[in-house]
Every structure is written in C-alpha cells, then in structure tokens.
C-alpha cells in the first residue's frame, strides 16, 4: 500500500505537501468513514479502498510524546480480539505442562541449559517480561528476560530485586522474596563477580524458541496470557477487598491501571494491545461480581476460561 501524507483534510504524495492526490483517489473514500484525531501529527494514510481498509492498517500518526499510533479497520480489530481469546485459552491449557517442565529441571544440581530454561520459564510465567532479543540490546540498549545481566540482579538476605530498563525506556523492578520458589534458583544462577555476564549465559534465542515450541505456543503468547491473568487476579482481589465496591466500569479501570503498573505499560496500551475483549465484556456484568465474591481465584479463572472458550468455539 502506498503511503499518502495527510494535512488539513487533504492527501499528498510527498511529505512537503507539494503534490496533491487526485480527488478520485480511493483513500478519500476511506477518510469519509474515519476521524483522524486532531492531536496527531505526521499522519500517513494508506492508499486503499474502504472495503480493503476494513481488514488493514488505515492510518498512522504521532502523539504529543512522539510515539507512533496505529489505527486499524473494524474487521482487523475483531480478528485480533478473537486471536487474543484463542491465545488466552491455549496458554491456559498448557500451563500444567509448562510447570511440569519447570519442576523437573529446576531441581538439577548443575546450571546447564535445561536448568536455565526452567528458571527462564519460571520467571516468564511469574512476571511476563518481554523476551529480550539481542538485536534490541545492541540497537538501543533495551533489556528483556533473555538479555538480563548479573548487574541487573540485587541480592539481599531477604529478597532479590531485578531492575532493568526495557522497551520505550520504561524502568522495571521485580521483587523476589526469600519465601518465593524462584529465590534459590535465581541466587544460584547469579554471579556477582561478573556483572556484565548474561544471567542466562547458556541460552540463545533459538534454544528458547525450541523449548517453547514443544508446548504449541509462542513466547509472546505468554505475555498476552500474562496480562490477562494479572488483570483477572487483580480484579478478583479487588472484588474481595475493596469496600464499598465501585461500579463495574470504575472497578475495571482501577484493575487495568494496576495491571499496567505490573507489566510496565500505560493502561491504554494494556487494554488496546493485550486485553482479551471477551474477558472485559464478561466482568462488566454487575451480577457477575456476586459470583466472583464467592469463588476462589482458581475457580474464578476456570469460569472465565470456560466462558472465553465457549465464545471462541461459537
């Protein structure tokens, strides 16, 4: 698709706005159906018919902080939402197998690659940290789980603190208490004498991909699942503890904010880029709060999974 440059309701083929697009260009039909937010700058509209735009990227623009914002057609968003539902159910269904893999290999006396994979998977399923490709570390010093170094691990007698700067220069901090099952394996893996050494020095992107492949999911699926799992846990906790309970709308907004803080997003990104909409629609029901208040978290999670699964099957 050809990128066209937008200014004051007009389209141009160049970013100096010297060469206007003809009035019969199909992109103008698209503009009749969408509203481009006035606060966006450097807006690019993609040349396509309205029918094509329903399933594609329509336009991109920069917000006040210089971040590029992407706007898609209705059908694309519906397909993306349905995909998130499927990912949530798929990962839930393999979590027992993943935990079995962790339990089997984390008991090893050596710190071989399988031991490191077990610690990696335990950390990922606890904190849902971004993968951390080597190219991003080299290009902009963005750190993820695979590119953690010993210097990012601070050890004390009662806890271990993991600190690093991730995507979009967001600072992350995770605390592992001594009572947590991750504490001893992480302590065993960390070498204070080599601060620049990678924590997972026997792993590579290929080894992690091969490991995760056996479960029929992708590493990024764990993060999608994790955001929704964290939201559900926070929602369940809020229903149990917040008094008086706010309206479902306010409760959802509070829970999304809490979830975003845990995973290192803004609330809007958590909701737009990761949340399964079937889950959001489910918890909007005021009568559902009574069900939540009477269940354990595992029971609540099972109810949600069954509902999402029935929605995807339908």
From Swiss-Prot:
Family label: Belongs to the type IB topoisomerase family.
PROSITE patterns: TOPO_IB_1 (PS00176), TOPO_IB_2 (PS52038)
Enzyme class, broadest EC rank: isomerase
EC code: 5.6.2.1
Major place of residence: virion
Record protein name field: DNA topoisomerase I
Induction notes from the record: Expressed in the late phase of the viral replicative cycle.
Localization terms from the record: Virion
Catalytic center residues: 274
Keywords per UniProt: DNA-binding, Isomerase, Late protein, Topoisomerase, Virion
A molecular-function term among this protein's GO annotations: DNA topoisomerase type I (single strand cut, ATP-independent) activity
SUPFAM superfamilies: DNA breaking-rejoining enzymes (SSF56349), DNA topoisomerase I domain (SSF55869)
Catalytic activity: ATP-independent breakage of single-stranded DNA, followed by passage and rejoining
Signal peptide from the UniProt entry: none
Function: Releases the supercoiling and torsional tension of DNA introduced during the DNA replication and transcription by transiently cleaving and rejoining one strand of the DNA duplex. Introduces a single-strand break via transesterification at the specific target site 5'-[CT]CCTTp site in duplex DNA. The scissile phosphodiester is attacked by the catalytic tyrosine of the enzyme, resulting in the formation of a DNA-(3'-phosphotyrosyl)-enzyme intermediate and the expulsion of a 5'-OH DNA strand. The free DNA strand then undergoes passage around the unbroken strand thus removing DNA supercoils.
Single Gene Ontology BP annotation: DNA topological change
InterPro entries: DNA_brk_join_enz, DNA_topo_I_N_sf, TopoI, TopoI_cat_a-hlx-sub_euk, TopoI_cat_euk, TopoI_N_vir, TopoIB_AS
Domain Topo IB-type catalytic: 77-314
């Amino acid at each position: 698709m050809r990128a066209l440059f937008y200014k004051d309701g007009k389209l141009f083929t160049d970013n100096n706005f010297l060469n206007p697009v003809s009035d019969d260009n199909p992109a103008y039909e698209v503009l009749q159906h969408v509203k481009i937010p006035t606060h966006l700058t450097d807006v690019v509209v993609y040349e396509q018919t309205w029918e094509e735009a329903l399933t594609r990227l329509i336009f991109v623009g920069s917000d006040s902080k210089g971040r590029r914002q992407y706007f898609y057609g209705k059908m694309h968003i519906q397909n993306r939402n349905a995909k998130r539902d499927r990912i949530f159910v798929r990962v839930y269904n393999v979590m027992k197998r993943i935990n079995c893999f962790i339990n089997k290999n984390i008991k090893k006396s050596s710190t071989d690659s399988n031991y490191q994979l077990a610690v990696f998977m335990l950390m990922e399923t606890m904190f849902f940290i971004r993968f951390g490709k080597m190219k991003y570390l080299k290009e902009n010093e963005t750190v993820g789980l695979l590119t953690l170094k010993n210097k990012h691990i601070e050890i004390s007698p009662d806890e271990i603190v993991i600190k690093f700067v991730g995507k979009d220069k967001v600072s992350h901090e995770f605390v592992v208490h001594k009572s947590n099952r991750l504490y001893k394996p992480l302590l065993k893996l960390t070498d204070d004498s080599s601060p620049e050494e990678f924590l997972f020095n026997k792993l590579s992107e290929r080894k992690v991909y091969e490991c995760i492949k056996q479960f029929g999911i992708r590493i990024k699926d764990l993060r999608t699942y994790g955001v929704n799992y964290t939201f559900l846990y926070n929602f369940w906790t809020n229903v149990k503890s917040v008094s008086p309970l706010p309206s479902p709308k306010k409760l959802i907004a509070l829970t999304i904010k809490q979830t975003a803080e845990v995973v290192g997003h803004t609330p809007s990104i958590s909701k737009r880029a990761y949340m399964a909409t079937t889950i959001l629609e489910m918890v909007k029901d005021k009568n559902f709060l009574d069900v939540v208040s009477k269940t354990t978290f595992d029971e609540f999670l099972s109810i949600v999974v069954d509902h999402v699964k029935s929605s995807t099957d339908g």
